[in-house]
From Swiss-Prot:
Belongs to the histone H2A family. The gene is Macroh2a1. The modification Phosphoserine is found at S170, S173. CDD domains: HFD_H2A, Macro_H2A-like. Residues 144-160 have a biased composition (Basic residues). It is found in: Nucleus; Chromosome. The modification Phosphothreonine is found at T129, T178. It comes from Mus musculus. This is Core histone macro-H2A.1. Keywords: Acetylation, Chromatin regulator, Chromosome, DNA-binding, Isopeptide bond, Methylation, Nucleosome core, Nucleus, Phosphoprotein, Ubl conjugation.
Length: 369
């Protein structure tokens, strides 16, 4: 009561405030009634609509902010919103027919064409092409044919033939790849932004990639399968580099990753990661985090290629199928969330037929678009 005996003026609480949302519930109700004048509209319909729109807006703004950050821009533009929508599968399906003003367009490049352009410059193609050329020159019957066609044409033909072989291998999921320097490319998959995933049958210590991944424990133990292989190939220099890293870094936490120089190895760097044990608390999330941390370290060094073993499926006890699914899921989501990545090729270095079959099968399930 006021001093004059009248009632206090009570401030009206809006429907949005009552529902706990920011978007205007009353306006949503008017929009729904305009479109459906013959139907009765429930009280909860505009509230639910406002909540959904608010959630979608926040999601798009978060992804657009990540795109602006990755492109080193301080302000979110319509272009970043377009990229955010295009790189999220659900949002892309929802807003497929929506035009974003001043957002530009996304080039519709077929993944195979993109892979050919990048593959001709990549290290893997450079490794694959020499052996067939040597085989073609070694027989006495094929030498005059090479002279007639010319060096450049012969090289182009050999590249085309090898491309057909690799495509057949990836399509049929067989072990008929292109054998080169002790390893065979069994299957290739291109992701949305052009990164290539390749299943390779070989020893991880023999591949000439920018980085190889070494699954270890908190003390940087090198007694596992991958650690033993790298230690034999790298020798004392590799062991000393690991010891120095252990002193500088200290114990390696679960899902953590640290990098050292690849002394004595074809690879430039070795990324040591501490993967979780199967059955531990949140082991699946931690395995995904382990893979993403390895990729982030490679991106920090501006590396273009990285080779993974089957992390977690050895002594840590992960089922091979589960480990493959989690690793591929982590890699795919990493490249979607990180708009600008220096990594162009990811190798999976496998040696047993069971792991090879699982990775080829799981890679075929990934959507290249």
């Amino acid at each position: 009561m006021s001093s004059r005996g009248g009632k206090k003026k009570s401030t009206k609480t809006s429907r949005s405030a009552k529902a706990g949302v920011i978007f205007p519930v009353g306006r949503m109700l008017r929009y729904i009634k305009k479109g459906h004048p013959k139907y009765r509209i429930g009280v909860g319909a505009p509230v639910y609509m406002a909540a959904v729109l608010e959630y979608l807006t926040a999601e798009i703004l978060e992804l657009a902010g990540n795109a602006a950050r990755d492109n080193k821009k301080g302000r979110v533009t319509p272009r970043h919103i377009l990229l955010a929508v295009a790189n999220d599968e659900e949002l892309n399906q929802l807003l497929k027919g929506v035009t974003i003003a001043s957002g530009g367009v996304l080039p519709n490049i077929h993944p195979e064409l993109l892979a050919k352009k990048r593959g001709s410059k990549g290290k893997l193609e450079a490794i694959i092409t020499p052996p067939p050329a040597k085989k073609a020159k070694s027989p006495s019957q094929k030498k005059p044919v090479a002279k007639k066609t010319g060096g450049k044409k012969g090289a182009r033909k050999s590249k085309k033939k090898q491309g057909e072989v690799s495509k057949a291998a990836s399509a049929d999921s067989t072990t008929e790849g292109t054998p080169t320097d002790g390893f065979t490319v069994l299957s290739t998959k291109s992701l949305f932004l052009g990164q290539k995933l390749q299943v390779v049958q070989a020893d991880i210590a023999s591949i000439d990639s920018d980085a190889v991944v070494h699954p270890t424990n908190t003390d940087f133990y090198t007694g596992g399968e991958v650690g033993n292989t790298l230690e034999k190939k790298g020798g004392k220099e590799f062991v000393e580099a690991v010891l120095e890293l252990r002193k500088k870094n200290g114990p390696l936490e679960v899902a953590g990753a640290a990098i050292s120089a690849g002394h004595g190895l074809p690879a430039k760097f070795v990324i040591h990661c501490n993967s979780p044990v199967w059955g531990a608390d949140k082991c699946e999330e931690l395995l995904e985090k382990t893979v993403k941390n390895c990729l982030a370290l490679a991106d920090d060094r501006k590396l273009k290629s990285i080779a993974f073993p089957s992390i977690g499926s050895g002594r840590n006890g992960f089922p091979k199928q589960t480990a493959a699914q989690l690793i591929l899921k982590a890699i795919s989501s990493y490249f979607v969330s990180t708009m600008s990545s220096s990594i162009k090729t990811v190798y999976f270095m496998l040696f047993d037929s069971e792991s090879i079959g699982i990775y080829v099968q799981e890679m075929a399930k990934l959507d290249a678009n």
